[in-house]
A protein has these predicted regions:
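Alpha/beta-hydrolase-fold catalytic nucleophile elbow
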Residues: 1
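Conserved alpha/beta-hydrolase catalytic His-Asp/Glu region
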Residues: 4-10, 18-75
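Short aromatic-enriched loop/helix-cap "lid" or pocket-rim segments at secondary-structure transitions
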Residues: 5-11, 93-96, 120-121
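N-proximal accessory regions
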Residues: 15, 77-80
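Alpha-helical elements of the RecA-like P-loop NTPase motor core of helicases
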Residues: 59, 92, 127
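Conserved loop-alpha-helix segment in the C-terminal half of the alpha/beta-hydrolase fold
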Residues: 79-114, 119
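Catalytic active-site module of serine/aspartate enzymes centered on a nucleophile-bearing elbow/loop
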Residues: 105-139
Length: 139
């Protein structure tokens, strides 16, 4: 689920309601909204990849975002890498709120990318993951 809820539960449920009713129809609009800042050359790939997801998988992923158990039940005491697109929507204290739950978190915000930063800048993303794994001796 989400590390922290991004809105009260009833608002999150309402936000995802179109996806629960008609995943493919709702997902197209949802994805397009997240692609507004996206690099034009990868937009079709991202959109087609996301829409190829089976309905039950997409719906399950959305439902897990309703689970706020991390926010309400203790800490994650393992190394965590958070890579997020810079967005004025995020609360100003998000880094502090996240690291309170996961004290070993490495928190990165990236400019010039959308929600799909791993698909827009795969080499840079993979390098950050590789460095994180190496630094934390996870392999």
């Amino acid at each position: 689920g989400a590390l922290l809820p991004f809105a009260p539960r009833d608002q999150v449920e309402k936000f995802f309601e179109p996806l629960f009713k008609d995943y493919k129809g709702g997902a197209a609009t949802f994805i397009d909204g997240m692609l507004q800042k996206s690099h034009a050359e990868v937009r079709p790939f991202i959109r087609s990849s996301m829409l190829a997801t089976p309905d039950y998988v997409g719906i399950s992923a959305m439902r897990t975002m309703l689970d706020d158990s991390y926010a309400t039940h203790g800490n994650i005491n393992l190394p965590v890498l958070a890579t997020m697109a810079q967005d004025p929507f995020w609360p100003k204290d998000m880094r502090e709120r996240y690291t309170k739950i996961a004290p070993k978190m490495e928190f990165q915000t990236w400019d010039g990318v959308s929600h799909f930063l791993h698909m827009e800048k795969p080499k840079e993303f993979n390098e950050q993951v590789r460095l994180f794994i190496s630094k934390n001796k996870l392999l």
